[in-house]
Amino acid sequence: MRTENTATLNLIWGALILEELARLGVQHVCMAPGSRSTPLTLAAAQQTKLQRHLHFDERGLGFMALGLAKASRAPVAIITTSGTAVANLYPAIVEAWLTHVPLIVLSGDRPPELLGCGANQAIVQPGIFANYATQVNLPTPDAHIAPQALLTTVDEAVANQTRPVHINCMYREPLYPSELSGVILDAESPYLKPLQTWLQLARPYTQYGKSKQLSSPSDDAIMRFVHGKGVIVVGTLTPEQDPQQLIALSQKIGWPLLTDAQSQLRQHPAAIGNIDQLLQHPKARNLLQEADRVLVFGGRLLSKRVIGYLAEQNWHSYWQVLPEQDRLDPSHNAKHIWHANAEQFAALNWYRSSSANWANTLITYNDELHNLFVRNIDQGEFGEAQVIRAIANTRPLEQQLFIGNSLPVRLYDMYAPVSCCTATTYTNRGASGIDGLLATACGIAAHEGKPTSLIIGDLSQLHDLNSLAIAKGLSSPLVIVILNNDGGNIFNLLPVPNEQVRSEYYRLSHGLEFGYAAAMFNLPYNQVDNLADFQDSYNEALDFQGASIIEVNVSQNQASDQIAALNLWVKQS
């Protein structure tokens, strides 16, 4: 076999990796500029099966990939150069690992002889993501290593993977070929001779069967489980699990459906969406305490009240349904975990409960809260909850929501309106950081071009200001709604010892507005301080083919004061 020169062989290895990833279901590749990753970059530039996305900031790049993977329900590749470029992906990789989102990091690296000797931009990259990624360390490209070995290495690491994989790619110089031929994977190349059949086909070199096994209870177990007073709690579910099937399940069994903000069912009229607030409603809480059976779909519940309810009840039977093997119960209840998605589990042979409709009064209490929120939020003072309810009520079938962490997602969970339907809803609630939220929303918006709304706090937006560059490149509607309450005002809800400490060390008031940031990236911008102006700006932004910013200015105490007042009313109901 003729020995390929270094630059050409580097490029062939890069092309083999990207071609195999495309065959394994990857649709998008996110790339940051850098020299050591040149073989991967040049291969990606000529790969026609992948959509390419570029950004200069690797932290934002990782979160954009996270959003693309969430929206496409497929793995996304990320290409970076060596050094701290790789380290900047860490927050996104952590979030992806915790929420089972498949990201594939392809990091360029120095060869072994340039590590630990003071060579430029060289750090120890294998294992950099610790327990948050499956690690694959490739040697420097070598003509004595069969190309089949490279393909089977990629296949074994990526096939059926639901979490991040880090493939570290060492390259020796020269990195740049003297010229780029039209076809990198040339069938005439002696090195590729063993892959002649693979080159003519479109399937992966190794085809793995699906490894997921559905676990489900027997008919007899189901009959015994539903014999009593029970509740169905729906936590975080992804849209592809078809959560709508849980409405029919709830009605068939005759148990109430208690829905989290991330359930895709929070606003459904047949669900008890106001469960967080109902748990401080005396009559509703007393009724819910009669339940002795619980069926939980998903995990990562947002409401501390719901988590507390699940922890405090003396459950006769506790079932949890998860699509992956996970431990998602901070209260450590004794339970039976079934491995299935929501749609599969709802399709089992369910029976009517012997105590069907035992909690129908919850519907009345839920409706009472709905009316309370209409009067005191929708028809009350302009504020954060009012804006969130207005967004949730606007064109839910036409758009998708990404709700930021800290206060926005909690306000949605507490006060989202009941409506005909719920927009497809995304969050980053694995590690629940405030970093990368705009970049994630950009990835979600970029996948299929569906109008997308991001609800984000001011500190979260400041944290991800660089990602306005990604937003600038979008050609589909992305409405960035910034709730600017001048600092981290979720700390108003927490028992910080005194107001001075809260202000100086937690809230971090900044006095900044976002108009100049919008101008810097040439994005349409509106600043509003009343509901009518917000609704006009919001509807206009949903029809704009690109990203735009609406800044909502409210006082530091508006949301916390309103929450306190509503809590008082609910407790006195």
Curated annotation (Swiss-Prot):
GO terms for molecular function: 2-succinyl-5-enolpyruvyl-6-hydroxy-3-cyclohexene-1-carboxylic-acid synthase activity; magnesium ion binding; manganese ion binding; thiamine pyrophosphate binding. Pathway: Quinol/quinone metabolism; 1,4-dihydroxy-2-naphthoate biosynthesis; 1,4-dihydroxy-2-naphthoate from chorismate: step 2/7; Quinol/quinone metabolism; menaquinone biosynthesis. Binds 1 thiamine pyrophosphate per subunit. Disulfide bonds: none annotated. Its EC number is 2.2.1.9. One of its GO terms (biological process) is menaquinone biosynthetic process. The keyword Cytoplasm does not apply. Its cofactor is Mg(2+); Mn(2+); thiamine diphosphate. InterPro entries: DHS-like_NAD/FAD-binding_dom, MenaQ_synth_MenD, MenD_middle, THDP-binding, Thiamin_PyroP_enz_TPP-bd_dom, TPP_enzyme_TPP-bd. It catalyses: isochorismate + 2-oxoglutarate + H(+) = 5-enolpyruvoyl-6-hydroxy-2-succinyl-cyclohex-3-ene-1-carboxylate + CO2. The keyword Transferase applies. It comes from the Bacteria. NCBIfam families: menD (TIGR00173). HAMAP family: MenD. Belongs to the TPP enzyme family. MenD subfamily. Catalyzes the thiamine diphosphate-dependent decarboxylation of 2-oxoglutarate and the subsequent addition of the resulting succinic semialdehyde-thiamine pyrophosphate anion to isochorismate to yield 2-succinyl-5-enolpyruvyl-6-hydroxy-3-cyclohexene-1-carboxylate (SEPHCHC). This is 2-succinyl-5-enolpyruvyl-6-hydroxy-3-cyclohexene-1-carboxylate synthase. The lineage of its organism: Bacteria, Pseudomonadati, Pseudomonadota, Gammaproteobacteria, Alteromonadales. The gene is menD.
